[in-house]
Each structure stands twice: as C-alpha cells, then as structure tokens.
C-alpha cells in the first residue's frame, strides 16, 4: 500500500502556519508522497485569499491589533486565524484527484467530516461543500492547485472570536454589525479534543485514499522551498498582489450561501443580507438606490 506521509508540526509561527504547507505542496508536486499535515499558529493573524484585493482587509485595524497579514495561495476572502484553531492540510498529486473541482473537494473533505464525527461532532458535508452542524459552518476550508499538487486546507475551530474576525474586514460600521450577527448564527466552534481529531483524520484519510499513514518530515527540497516562501510571504509585493479594479458592489461571504452585499453612492448606502437565494433583510438610506442594489445582487449572482 502506498504511503500517506503524516507531518505534525505542532505549534508554529503565524508565517510558518502558511509557508509550511505551501512547501509541502511543492514537494508533492515534485514527487513526494501524498501528505496530511497539522499545525497550529502560535498567535493571531489575518490570511488573505490569493485573488482578493488587499483593500478588503482593514490594515489599520490589523496594525493596531498587532496582527500580521499574509496572502495565501488558496482562494477565499479575509480570514481571522488564531491559536484556538487546529489547521489540517491534505496534499495529493493532481493526477490522484477527480478532474472536477466539485468532486475533488468532496473527496478531500469527506474524510475530515468523518474525523469530526469520530471526535464527537455531528458534522455533515452539505450541498454547498461546507462542513456544517445544522446551518452553521464549523470548518473554514480552501483549495488550490500548486504546480502539480492539489491542496485542501481546513481547521478545527475550538474557540472563535466573531467580533475580532469582523474587525479585520474593511467594512462600514453598519455592515460590520450585520456580519457579526450572521457569523454568530452561521459560524460555530467545536471545542473537542484536537488530539482525538488528528488521530481520527489520519485514519479517515488513510482509509478513504487507500494509503498507509507513515510519520514523515520535510524533504531537503521542501526545506529549500520553505526558505524561499518565508521571504515571498513577507514581501510587500506579494502581499499587495495583482491590482484589481474595485467592484461595483462590495460583498462579504459568511459561509456558502450567506452574504452581505452593499453599494455606496455619494455618501448613500444600501445593504442587503442574502441567505440561500433569498434576500433576508435590506437597509436602504435612499429609495433611489433600490434599483442599483437589485442590479448589484443580480450581477453578483447571489439571488436568482
């Protein structure tokens, strides 16, 4: 039976909680075995998805709170990460996963669901590929292809500071208040034993992928890539990312299917909350913005 390399890095710096698994992806791309890794950041910080505008993070609030900001190579928005989150990453050669992104994501998240369940959390993978208990997301995940490797990252959230998570987003106050309200409903921590979760994840991924879990470590090539990644992730150019035009309307995703969308014109603002494909609530400071908000929602494809 081929190996599933298991690497548990334990507690690491905020920077390394990102660069280590990127290094593993380059290693697997170059021929290292499929790898399941674990780590926990030693301090809070903010992660930014690969394709997102840096302006989506409130950099002044991050500086004031002493939170570093790192751009990662998987998608998603601005996320608050801290020492109360157990990170896990599964990395496979691209040839070993289904071609369809949807199918690949389900295949690589289902063992995580099994691990949550084994640790005592009644988790399910819903139709939006969110790991949930009821309507609440319990695991933030992201996915990417890095060279010839596919990586899916996720977290076991033992405690979650919804207010701190909303504070790092660049939002008008009324939008921030709505995001906190939605996070409290739709993002839930699962305070279970992280060691039990890790053991269950190792067993579940080994079984699902037909691989034999074997303790491992970084290869020389991965150590080399790690040094390079540490430098890249610290560079202002990498953090700034590609220049993208500001969107006509702004939106924050709380979980799949739950968004706050808003537009601003000449100091006036219209805000809508979307749950499923229904508009849950709307606040418009000027009736003239109604049409613009409706058009923005249609354009964002959040409401049919």
Residues covered by each model-derived region:
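Structural motif
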Residues: 133-134, 265
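N-terminal lobe of the biotin/lipoate ligase/transferase fold
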Residues: 1-103
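Contiguous, small/hydrophobic- and glycine-enriched helical/loop subdomains that border
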Residues: 83-132
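Short, surface-exposed charged micro-motifs
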Residues: 37, 78, 122, 142, ...
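Internal helical hairpin/lid segments
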Residues: 237-281
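Long, positively charged amphipathic alpha-helical accessory segments at protein N-termini or as interdomain linkers
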Residues: 23, 31, 106-122, 137-139, ...
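Active-site- and interface-proximal helix/loop "cap" or "latch" segments in soluble metabolic
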Residues: 267-304
């Amino acid at each position: 039976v081929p190996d599933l390399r298991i690497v548990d890095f334990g507690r690491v710096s905020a920077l390394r909680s990102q660069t280590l698994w990127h290094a593993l992806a380059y290693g697997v791309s170059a021929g290292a075995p499929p790898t399941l890794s674990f780590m926990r950041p030693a301090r809070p910080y903010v992660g930014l998805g690969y394709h997102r505008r840096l302006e989506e993070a409130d950099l002044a609030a991050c500086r004031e709170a002493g939170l570093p900001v790192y751009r990662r190579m998987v998608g998603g928005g601005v996320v608050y990460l801290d020492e109360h989150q157990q990170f896990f990453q599964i990395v496979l050669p691209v040839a070993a996963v289904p071609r369809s992104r949807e199918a690949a994501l389900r295949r690589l998240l289902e063992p995580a669901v099994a691990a949550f369940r084994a640790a005592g959390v009644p988790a399910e993978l819903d139709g939006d590929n969110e790991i949930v208990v009821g309507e609440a997301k319990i695991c933030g995940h992201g996915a990417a292809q890095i060279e010839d490797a596919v990586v899916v990252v996720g977290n076991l959230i033992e405690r979650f500071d919804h207010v701190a998570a909303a504070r790092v987003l660049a939002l008008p106050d009324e939008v921030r208040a709505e995001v906190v309200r939605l996070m409290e409903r739709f993002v839930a921590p699962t305070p279970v034993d992280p060691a039990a979760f890790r053991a269950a994840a190792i067993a579940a991924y080994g079984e699902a992928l037909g691989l034999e879990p074997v303790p491992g470590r970084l290869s020389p090539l991965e150590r080399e890539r790690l040094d390079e990644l540490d430098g890249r992730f610290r560079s202002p150019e990498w953090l700034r990312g590609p220049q993208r035009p500001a969107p006509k309307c702004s939106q924050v995703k709380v979980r799949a299917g739950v968004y706050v969308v808003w537009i601003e014109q000449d100091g006036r603002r219209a805000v809508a909350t979307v749950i499923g494909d229904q508009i849950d609530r709307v606040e418009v400071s000027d009736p003239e913005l109604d049409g613009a908000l409706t058009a923005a929602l249609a354009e964002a494809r959040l409401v049919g």
